[in-house]
Each structure stands twice: as structure tokens, then as C-alpha cells.
């Protein structure tokens, strides 16, 4: 499994130790998501773009007709996956590009403060949420929402990123 991270934020001073810890955390979360749903790990590629509110607003407007920033967008390469998918591929030697996840770090920072937890926890949640969308999960109705939320919380808890309720 390969996770490619592109940081498109402009004018942001990046602390190397934070970037390295995010890379490791996000790779572990990607593995955990894939393993949890039984998706093949070998030769799987995922792209993550870290961006700002303005860039994600433009993408949200273009692809969802919602002209406002959002926290996370996902663009799956495998159309038609659903949360009951049986992940078998015709050519086991071919690489599998799962898709792209875009996270607005600006929105993640606001939400972390609003929810009273760390930015690391919020980034982890948004990444897992995006991963599950790439894997066919959705939250269009209450049943889907409950199933997806339970899986998100299980993965985050197993990685030590559970919510701290005060």
C-alpha cells in the first residue's frame, strides 16, 4: 500500500516533525481501513491532498454544486463499490489506485478546536471518513450513517485516536 501526500497549502510554515508524524499516522490509518473491510493491501495506491478552504471550496462547487468549503472530499477510482463489496480483481498483479482524498486543513483546525480535541485526531477522523467513502461507504440515510460512523470510531479507537469526552 502506498499513500501519496501532496501539500497544496500556500504560505504555511510546516514543522517537519509534525509532517512526519502525520505521514506515519495516516499510513497506519490507511492500512487499518483496508484491513477492516478486507481490501487487498498489495499494490494499492491512495492520494491525499492537504489544502485550504478556498481550494476545497472550488472543488466542492465544481463536483457537488455546493459553493462553500467543506472538510473532506473523496474521489473514488473504482465506481460502484459499496460497503458490501467483495474485493476481487481480474489481474492480481495490476496496481489498484483506490482514489483521492482532499482535506482542508483550515477546516480541520477549526473543527478540532470546536470539538475540543487535537488536530491530529481531527485529521485522522477526516482521513478515515474519506477512506471509507473510497471503499464504497456512504451516509445517505440513517442506516448507512450509523454503519459508517461505527466503523470510523472502531478504526480510530484501535489506532488510539478515540474521542476524549469531557
From Swiss-Prot:
<comment type="function">
    <text>Single strand-specific metallo-endoribonuclease involved in late-stage 70S ribosome quality control and in maturation of the 3' terminus of the 16S rRNA.</text>
</comment>
<dbReference type="GO" id="GO:0004521">
    <property type="term" value="F:RNA endonuclease activity"/>
</dbReference>
<keyword id="KW-0255">Endonuclease</keyword>
<dbReference type="GO" id="GO:0006364">
    <property type="term" value="P:rRNA processing"/>
</dbReference>
<keyword id="KW-0690">Ribosome biogenesis</keyword>
<feature type="binding site">
    <location>
        <position position="139"/>
    </location>
    <ligand>
        <name>Zn(2+)</name>
    </ligand>
</feature>
<keyword id="KW-0540">Nuclease</keyword>
<protein>
    <recommendedName>
        <fullName>Endoribonuclease YbeY</fullName>
        <ecNumber>3.1.-.-</ecNumber>
    </recommendedName>
</protein>
<keyword id="KW-0698">rRNA processing</keyword>
<comment type="similarity">
    <text>Belongs to the endoribonuclease YbeY family.</text>
</comment>
<keyword id="KW-0479">Metal-binding</keyword>
<dbReference type="InterPro" id="IPR023091">
    <property type="entry name" value="MetalPrtase_cat_dom_sf_prd"/>
</dbReference>
<feature type="binding site">
    <location>
        <position position="133"/>
    </location>
    <ligand>
        <name>Zn(2+)</name>
    </ligand>
</feature>
<dbReference type="InterPro" id="IPR002036">
    <property type="entry name" value="YbeY"/>
</dbReference>
<feature type="binding site">
    <location>
        <position position="129"/>
    </location>
    <ligand>
        <name>Zn(2+)</name>
    </ligand>
</feature>
<dbReference type="InterPro" id="IPR020549">
    <property type="entry name" value="YbeY_CS"/>
</dbReference>
<dbReference type="GO" id="GO:0008270">
    <property type="term" value="F:zinc ion binding"/>
</dbReference>
<dbReference type="GO" id="GO:0005737">
    <property type="term" value="C:cytoplasm"/>
</dbReference>
<keyword id="KW-0963">Cytoplasm</keyword>
<keyword id="KW-0378">Hydrolase</keyword>
<dbReference type="Pfam" id="PF02130">
    <property type="entry name" value="YbeY"/>
</dbReference>
<dbReference type="GO" id="GO:0004222">
    <property type="term" value="F:metalloendopeptidase activity"/>
</dbReference>
<keyword id="KW-0862">Zinc</keyword>
